[in-house]
Structures are given as structure tokens and as C-alpha cells.
């Protein structure tokens, strides 16, 4: 079944507010796909949080880790991996 919407969340050292963002997006349920794009975070727990949620919600969340390429590359990585009918960057 195709997801209705893909939410892409480009992240860079974003641990302080990631959980709130992800928990809010999870309210969309199985109709949504959430792609967490870790853009080379090194100063906090961003990569671990991405992996934690991807393991906990494997049918909804995908974690992608890449070298730092900036916000635009995070958005593009989300587009390349999106399967939803609609696409939204958060």
C-alpha cells in the first residue's frame, strides 16, 4: 500500500527537539512515512535517536545517515527515498 504522505525531517545536531517532532508526526499513523535524514551529526545523539525510532516503528520511519551536505541535500535525500503520494519537509 502506498503511503499518503512522506514527511522528510532533515536533522543536524537536532537531538534537543527531535523526539517532540517525531512524536507529533507519528500521530498521522500508518498513512504516513517519516524519513529522518541525519546530515552528519557529530555533537549529540541525533544519529542514535534516528535509529531508535526507525527500529521502534519500522513500517513508518526510515533513518538515513549521510555525510554533511547541508539542508538542501537532506531535503533531496528525502525526495529520493520518498514513497508517499505527497511530500512535506518538516
Question: What residue spans do the PLM features occupy?
Answer:
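Short, acidic, metal-binding catalytic loop of nucleotide-sugar glycosyltransferases
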Residues: 23-32
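Glycine-rich, basic loop-to-helix element that forms the pyrophosphate-binding segment
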Residues: 66-82
Amino acid at each position: 500500500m502506498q503511503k499518503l504522505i512522506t514527511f522528510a525531517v532533515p536533522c543536524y545536531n537536532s537531538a534537543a527537539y527531535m523526539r517532540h517532532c517525531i512524536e507529533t508526526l507519528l500521530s498521522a499513523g500508518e498513512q504516513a512515512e517519516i524519513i529522518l535524514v541525519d546530515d552528519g551529526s557529530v555533537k549529540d545523539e541525533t544519529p542514535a535517536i534516528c535509529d531508535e525510532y526507525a527500529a521502534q516503528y519500522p513500517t513508518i520511519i526510515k533513518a538515513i545517515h549521510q555525510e554533511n551536505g547541508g539542508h538542501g541535500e537532506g531535503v533531496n535525500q528525502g525526495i529520493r527515498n520518498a514513497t508517499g503520494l505527497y511530500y512535506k519537509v518538516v
